[in-house]
């Protein structure tokens, strides 16, 4: 699916992650900022890309500012950002959940 608009979900509070999703041209490009990037960066990127793949989003620029979010929070914020970016806020895609 193609991203229709730039969307944001989450905060920069402790134990959260802020995901900004915008149009991309060459696959899914994740720009991650995190204090725990060295230990958990690969897992954070995996959760984001796996979630976007479930939405069939193949081209996107993702800006992720992590403040110690758990995988379930990362997935929830990515789902919200993707739904907003695709203009599907009112159409819940249960298969993604």
From Swiss-Prot:
Belongs to the CitD family. It comes from the Bacteria. Keywords: Cytoplasm, Phosphoprotein. Pfam families: ACP. It is found in: Cytoplasm. Its main location: cytoplasm. The gene is citD. GO terms for cellular component: cytoplasm. Covalent carrier of the coenzyme of citrate lyase. This is Citrate lyase acyl carrier protein. The modification O-(phosphoribosyl dephospho-coenzyme A)serine is found at residue 14. Oligomer with a subunit composition of (alpha,beta,gamma)6.
